[in-house]
Every structure is written in C-alpha cells, then in structure tokens.
C-alpha cells in the first residue's frame, strides 16, 4: 500500500504552468456520463499511480455532490470501441500509451489534451431503479442507460415505439415541459396527417384522430396508445405541411434516438410523447425512464462485449457476451435484426459452476455443459473474468437492499390497489413507487438442472398485452385460460404489446376500464399487431430467455407495470418442448400453441438478487448456492474464478468456480421467497395417491407436481394456483378459464386484510379454535404400553407419552395472549375431519393417513438479528433422486411460538407454547431460539403429542447441511424402515450445541441402554393428568394442530389458570416418579441394535479436546427425563436414553464422577470405603444437573504432561534401558526417617471404586488419545488430570496423612518408568512423594547446597534416563526433607523446578522461579537448624 495518495483532486482544466509540476507528474482525463457535452474531470497523477487512487478521488468528488452509490460506478478504458473496466490495483501507465509514460509534456498531446483517458461508467447494473439511494446516482444511471440505448443494436420492430416513448421521457427529464410554441394548429385540434406506403410502394394517406389532451393520466396514455399503434409500421411518412423544418426542433434527435429512427414520424411522435409528460418532475421522469429502459431489451441494462464463437473467426466476433445483474447471456451468431434473431443462452449465477480463461479462450461451465468463446486479446479475457466475478459478488452484497425495496413496493402496491382505477393509474405514473401489480410469469426450467439457466424466460402478462389480443387472432389469447397460459409461458419476453404497441401500452397498466376503452382501437392495427406478437414471441422463444429474466423492471419488484392486479403471480413452467420455428410462425400470423409439461402459478412478488436455485445435482444442499464469498483476484491473461484456495492465477490463465460458499447463511436470510424469486425453482413434491389425478397440461406432467405456493403477504386467502385449482379444495378442482382470467387481470376478489378461518386446513392467516367439545379424532390402533414417564422438554421438544394412570390433581397451563389479535372476528368453527393432514404449509395438498412416509423437516436457526422464520423442508419426495425442497419464506417475524418470542436461556422456565415435537434445536451460541422454530417443525413424534392423529408412519430423513452456523438438522425420533413395528427400539436424541461442520460419527456404545417405550394406546390420555376436562384436552389438541398448520398466527387455547407453573413442574416430576414405580423394566436392548435402528445420532460434543476446553452446557435445563450423562472415555456411549439413564431402577448405574475439590478432602478423610453416593455434589440451579460431574479443574491450569512415549519424540533422548534390564535393587524396608510424609498424589484410598472403575485410573489424555486403559498394578498413581487441580490434590494429601500405606508400597523405579509412559503424570511427582525411589536413581543430594552430585563419573547409559532428569530436577524440593521428619511441601501455585541443561531440558517445560528456589533453600536451612 502506498504511503500517500499520488493523485490530485479533480481539476476543471489541465493548463497549469510547467514550472509548478514535478517531472513525474502527468495529466489524466476522466470522461463523465452525458450525451450533449459530457463533462471532463482532470487529475494530476504520478507515473506510478494506480487506478484505485483515481477512483477514490472520483468518489470523493461525487460524494460532495450527494452521491451515495459510488460503488455502483467504475473507471473504464476504451479498448477497440468497448468499455473495459480497469483493474483497481493496476498502474495507470498500463492503460496509457507509451508516449504518456515517457512524455516530457506531463502527458499532454500537441493540443493540450491528456493522452490517457478514463471513463466514468456504471459497473454494476441493478434490478430495480428504486434501489438507487440519491438523485445524483439516479441521474448518472439514467445517463448510462441513454448511452446504452443509442449504442445497442436493438430489433427494430420491438424497439421503435419503445424508443420513441423513452425519448419523450428523456426530453421531459432534460428539458422539462415541452415549449408551447412547437405544436401547430392541427396538433392542437387533435389531428395529425400521415401517409404510409402500401404494397406497391404507393403512398396512401391515412388520418388518425388524436383525442384532446387531458390531465388524467389514463386518458393520456390511451391517446398515445391509439396514436402510436395506428402508425406503428409506417416506414416512410412524408413531412406534414405544417411541420417545421428540422432545424427548428428544440432538441437534437441524435441525442435521444438511434440513427435508424431519425425519421419525421419519430420526430413528431417524440414531441407528442414529450407533451404527454407535462408537469412531470425531472426525478420522476428519470426514474420512469430507467424502469422502462430496463424492460426493453436484455442488452440495455447490462454490459455487452463482442466475442468470437470460433478460434478461426476474424474480426471482433459475431457473439455478444452480456453481463447483467443475475448472470451472463450469450447472444450468438447472427446479427440482431428483425429477420434473424440470435440464439440466446442464459447462465444465472447459481447455475454457473466455473468461469475460466486460458489466454484468448474464455469458458463458461454450467453443470455438464460448457460454452467456449474467444476474445481478441488476453487482456480482454482477464478483464471480463474480473467483471463477472465482481458483478456476482456485488449482486450478493446488494441482496439486502433489494429485499427492502421489494417490501416497500409491495406495501405501496397494496395501498394503490384499493384506489379508484383512474386514480391508481395516475398515481402509478406520477409517483415513483406506486408500481407493483403486474402478473409476472417466470418460465422456470427444472429439467435443465445446471446446464442452462434456472429461469428460461420471464414475461409480463398484463392487460397491455391483452389490448392487442382483444382485436387480434388467435382467439384463445384474448382470455388467459389454462391452455393459453401454457402458450403464454413460452413467450420469452414481455413480447406482445409492450414491445409492439406504443407509449401507452408500455406504461399503462391493467385496469378494467381501459380494456373497454381499448376495444375501440382502429382495426388497421390489428393485423400488424398480430404479426408482431407472433414474430417477437417466437423469436424470443428460440432465444430461450429474455431481457426481463427477472432483472428488468417489468417483472422485478420495482416494476412500473405492476399496478392492476392483487398480487404478482409467478408461474413456474418446465419447458421441454422444442421451440417453434420463427419463420413459420411469422408467415402464418398466429402462434402455434405449445403446451408446457409442468407449471404452477404461484403467488407473491418477493424478488431478491440472491435467491436460491434448487439444483438436482446437489441434493444435500439445504441452502442456496448462490451466495458466495470469493477471495481470489484474477491477474494476467487467464484466471479461474474459484472459492477454493488453489494455485494463484498467472498471466495466462484464471478460474472462478462458484460451487460452495461461506455466505449461504446470509443468502437464506436475505432471500424472502425462492418461489417468487428470480433464480428460484422447486423440485416437484410427491402427493398422496388418494388425490384426484390431474391431467391438465398447465399444472404438470404428473399429479405429484403440485408445489407449495409462495408465501405472499398480499394474497393470503382465496388465492388460486396456476392450474386454476382452489387452494382450499383438497381435491384440486380446477377453476374455469373465465374465473382464472378474472383472477389474473385483477377482477377477482382478493381480501386486502388478514383472513381468519375456523378450519385448521385453510391457508388463512388466523385460525379460531372452538371452546366447546368436538368429536374425538380417529386414532390408529393402540400400540404397546406407555413408557414410565410423561414429560416433554420445553426446549428440545423431546416428549414422552403419558403415564397409564392420571394424577388426581388437574393441572392446566396458563395460556399467554397472542401478540397480535386477528383482524376480523372469528368465524364459527367447523368440526375437524377425522383424519387430518399431517402437515400443512401455505398451500400444499393434504397428506392422508396412509403408509406413506411423513415428511421430515429441517429447522433453520438463523444467526441474524431479524431473520425470517424458516419454512424449511416441506414434503420430502419418495424417490431417492429427488431433492428435498428448500423454502425461504417472506412471512413476517411471526412464528408458531408467538406467545413466547424471546430467546430462552438455559435456565429459563418451560415454554408452554412450544410444540410437542420430538426435535431439538440449538443455536451456535448455546441458546435455543425457540421463537425461530419453523411452522413445520417436525411432525415426527412417534409418541404422538397432544393431537397427532396418525402414529404409524415411516420417516424419510432429508439431507441437510450447515449454513454458516445457522442451521442444524433435526433428527427424528425413529429412522428405521419399519418404525411402526419397532416402537420399542425408538431412541430419544438430544442435539447439542455444535459449531458448524462438526457433525462427527458417534462412537459405538459399549453399554446396553434402555430404549424409550412405545407410544401410548390413546391420544386423550396424553394430558389426562394435566387437563381433566374434555374441553381443555380438546383445546390442547386443536392448538397443537395449529402448530403443524401453515397459519401466521395461532390463537392459544384458554386453559384454567388456577394452577401455577411451579405446580405444573411438581406434577410433572411426580408423574415421572409414579410412572417409575408402576412400570415394569423393559426388556434388555442391545446397544449395537439401537445404533442400527437410529443411525442418525450425533455426539453431544466433538471428540477430542472440546469437552476438556469448555464446560458442557447442553441445550436443556435440569429436567431429569430430558438430559443424559456424558462420561469421558471410549467405554461408554455418549448418548444415554434421557429417562432410562437417570430414572430406571433396572439400569446399571454409571461410573462415579470425580470429586469436587471441596469434597475431596472429606472423602479422603472418610477412608477408602466411602460410598459413591457421598461423591455427588449438587449442581447450580441454572446448570445441568449432571454438571456435578465436574470434568474440568476449577483452579489453576495444570502444568503440561510429559511427552507420551519418549522414544517417539523428535528430540534426541538418552537411550532407555531395555525391558529385560534388571532394575536397581530396592531396599527391603524403607527408612521411616527418610520417607516423605506426603502420600502419593492420588492414593488408592481416594478412589472408592477402585475395583470396578478402571477409567478413573487412566489419564484423560490417554483416554482421548485412544489408548487402552491399563491397570494401575497397585501404584496408586493414576491421576485424572482433567478432574482435580493440584491444589485439591495437595489438600487431600495433607488431610490423609497415611504413612503406613506409603511405607507398605515400595515402588520399583524400572516399573515406574515403564508405567510413566502411559500415565498422564510426571515422574517428578512420584519422586517427590517416595524417597525410596531416590536411591535407585543413584543421585546424591548435598544437604548444604541442595544440589545433586552423581556418585560416579562413569555412569552407565541406562542410568541417565528421564528418571534421572526428573529426579535431579526435583532435588531442590527433595533436599528440604533431608533430616526433618516433616517437610514443607511445595506451594500449589509454584512451578516445578527446571531440568538440567545437559539432559535436554527443551523436551519439557517445567521451570521454577529463582525467588522460590531461594525461599526453599532458606526454609531448608531453618529446618536444619531446628532439627
């Protein structure tokens, strides 16, 4: 990084005197956007200045003018007529001519102009003009689109009327209101005379009456629609007599229209359009211009570059490489004229797997397909790859802003829909954001997988298209029935009238009154319109996609065309038929109806830049693959855009791979709804076979292809599907073509408020539950007897069935009030049908009770501050190759736990609003975000919580993956193929707090554990001990049914508030004890069989050091039935049955836990016979009850253990004695006076379970390392370093004072060396406690100096072992007990003495402070004096 900026602030002129400039200074020109006389800024730069410095100064300049979106723009260089964006880190001299680098005139040419010019251009195109924050940014964006329209080659029959309309808007934005003197008398009277040539070249005059100008916007647009449509195909129009000469125009036509449209007709039409926008503000005109220009053609709101299709091709190339906000388009081969439209290939960002270039070759890979293009130079390929990478990253960054814009537009659109038709139209024309109500039809190709774009095309089906359809054959187009919709989906562009008809048809929106007004259009335009409709639609069908591929304003949330209907409907259509021949269609004059094989009209218009595309090739992707975080920079003549940290790109190659991402969590939080997104696509979901078969061609190839519709905030009730079926009708009876037409064009009845229903099977926002008794639901045949407990954890969702006998005392749950009351009074409730569906989403087909698998849901616990509740995982398909659908909902922050929306800490009281689900969710920070549980939170409880009507269902586990640290998959209760017959083998699973991507395979359990018993025989007995009354029990069941439904709000049943929460807890615990007393022990269950039954079991903690690094805070509170014991060591399974492990009398008790430091001394004083019951300590009230197993030292951290086997150390060690070597002789009887009174650090008396608990004798390190626990052989040195601190050990040693036992166990130094290899214990600890070992080391201690001296200078090599080093290191401590019968032991916080240097002390790290050594020597001398 440069120390200072070498670029000056912008200068107005570059005429500074030469003597004031340094020799290395150069002038640089920056051309700004503009048409007439673009402004130029000048910078004084250094020869070694970089592009980034100039960009920084430019941003500062525009920031002073109020620009907030400076990052939208970049600095480009003009290379071969194309604007290529310069690399910010490159030097300016790289893009300047050689004369600029070596210039002696400070980079100026002979005319005083800088030789190096940069251009200020839009680098990142956006989807909605409402994303622009300020007027300066909007003005520059408007100027860029004006430049693009003049430079792009657009199909003339599509563009000429649209360009005239845009020119009128540009005149209004640039010049304001039209001057009054420009119109002649005939214009004022409302007539214009024009002639058009007929087939023989003869000119025939035709007069079109133009209505008088009215201030009402809808009349203005109708007048323009009629006028421009009547003159749409007149190529040569003679000059009217009253038309002033060309020089009299108040504008330059070349600044507003391409050269091909410089005709008198275009001039007069421009003036008429300009007058129509009288009174419109400049900002509104620019905003409308941006909106309409984005919908015109795919090349306007994008970058276009010429590329070669073949290596041998000459020139700049015949293909267009288009980079826009959502991906890449390739317009291949032909010139873009009306006769031969180029073939279009679209690659959306989620579908692109890799972008790379190798010198002049540029390659795009999408799934199994690839496209190879060739550039004119290596540098162009490098800059193109950099642009694609930056655009992809920018689109992800901008997704949050697009989400906000979409919400704002939806709200304002809903408001404008309630206005009068004419008033709404005028508001939509004059207000910037009242523009969101058009039927958007997205053609989504799910059969193309990743090979092509996820969205093949988008088009707008609105009444401006119907304007032409009404008077134009074929007749089926006049009414969008289900058959005509299939054809309409194949039209890739907003075709029909928005391109062919004029001004008014482009901005006039679908209102019922205007249909009647447009029906009187002159018939001479009908034939022309028909031909245009067919031609343009078929051409764009062959292209495969459109400009509005959800990037344009027509179908994006910011669409000006969205005014007239109640909701934006996305129609997902799978197009598998071959495209229609364009020539044949044009000649026939009528489009050929081609039916799609699968489609579904889905409601909702939440469009974001980063919506997830479901890919069939990655079935385990839970979240979107579109959000990514690229870290590579491409340099040189080739590169690969990739996320993997591969080899750095060189000057000749580069790659950008777009597979995985670290921002997938962010993408899921940003994207509101996949179904209505630009990239979204869904896998078809299986239906139950009990549904009526559907044979219509619009809704799909099979009856299973119904999909959940979008979570729209507007169309909440009485909505419809694309096939015309009523969502509240389980049989999916289709609507008629007339009814569907009424709904599409806005004549249908949509409630503009939240709806309330009395049925749990509707798609309303509120459900009102009855207070009276209802008929009992049918249940399956009763299974085996109930388990000995009846409890459900409020966080994990683990629920057990009720006990056989109810507690006499009725317990009721106090129902919290709903946060939001329903908007309308409740409707009288309808009786619940006997077999209710298992799960209800917004609008899925109901699942009947059969042997089909029930869906397994995923709960996404989002880590953001305000995430949308995830509606993850609706209905899993039966076929293995099908992908579980992923849903990202637009629903507001209202979940099934609306009554309890706060985060629940570990010690919080139970939440009675939590669903009775056998699932567990823990967020990454350890707290359970229970208010973020999905509404489809797992209906997999085989224990049948309150109101589940079906018990025997198989479970299909869905693939899931972490999104950052956000999502944790829910493991269902049973995952066996025959769950209905194996209820006794079910196992409860408690998911812990796990960091992302730490799912480890659980170790096999070595102890048999009792499975949870089977479900109860009947549903009504579930809450019989809690709710005595039938009404209360029924309310609870109805409430639980709401939790599985698709509603936004849940009205909690009113229970008897006489019983408090504490009494409820007491009753629950009492039911546990009562169930234990009366339940017979279940049959023994083999642990490995349990692992086979439930394979998807996750460890509570990762394997190695994580349990030793932090306290284990499980996602549970101190409920005995919902926690489990986690013991160290491989001998025990980390997963116990939560109830059996701690409650069942037949269960074998777990090994005793290590003692707390406070209880250690008392246990030592009690003797070796102390029972294990005295070792349990009470846990804290807010902690897990099993945290009394204090696995971590509370005091100071222990010093590191010695290296494991010394022979494996990298450091050189003295040779160890062979195993056959005879150890030195051991004294037959130790001398009492020379014995240290300190017993071993952990004598056998401190381990009450010495015989049956070998794990506690093995060090934690040995256990985690996977070594086999070895018997202690009477050494009593098995310190568990993970359980007690040094302070606790020394305190226990001082209390014990067991001299006789220490004397009775004389240790062998060779055996101690052998044992010290596998013990987590320094040898110095044993030497400090047993003086008899010191003799065997042949070390003599000088009592005066406290230093050791070897007995002989010629020691054998076997004697110089680690024991010698450790014993000599501890000599400073041992020398204190030379003469005294008692010794002052080392302070617990003191470090161990250092090892001598000649013994390679770097292999261990025990040190001691010199001050401590001096203090010990003084104490030694005092002991000598006193003795």
From Swiss-Prot:
Keywords: Cell membrane, Developmental protein, Membrane, Phosphoprotein, SH3-binding, Transcription, Transcription regulation. Residues 818-838, 1001-1019, 1214-1230, 1237-1246 have a biased composition (Pro residues). The modification Phosphotyrosine is found at residues 227, 423, 679, 766, 1103. Pfam families: FERM_C (PF09380), FERM_M (PF00373). The modification Phosphoserine is found at residue 1181. Residues 688-710 have a biased composition (Basic and acidic residues). Residues 545-559, 860-877 have a biased composition (Low complexity). Its main location: membrane. The keyword Transferase does not apply. A motif (SH3-binding) lies at residues 1008-1020, 1149-1157. A motif (RXPPXY motif) lies at residues 842-847. The keyword Phosphoprotein applies. Activates the Hippo/SWH (Sav/Wts/Hpo) signaling pathway, a signaling pathway that plays a pivotal role in organ size control and tumor suppression by restricting proliferation and promoting apoptosis. The core of this pathway is composed of a kinase cascade wherein Hippo (Hpo), in complex with its regulatory protein Salvador (Sav), phosphorylates and activates Warts (Wts) in complex with its regulatory protein Mats, which in turn phosphorylates and inactivates the Yorkie (Yki) oncoprotein. Ex acts synergistically along with Mer and Kibra to regulate the Hippo signaling pathway. Forms a complex with Kibra and Mer. Interacts (via RXPPXY motif) with Kibra (via domain WW 1). Interacts with Mer and Hpo (via SARAH domain). Interacts with Schip1; the interaction results in recruitment of Schip1 to the apical cell membrane. Interacts with ack and yki. This is Protein expanded. It comes from Drosophila melanogaster. The lineage of its organism: Eukaryota, Metazoa, Ecdysozoa, Arthropoda, Hexapoda.
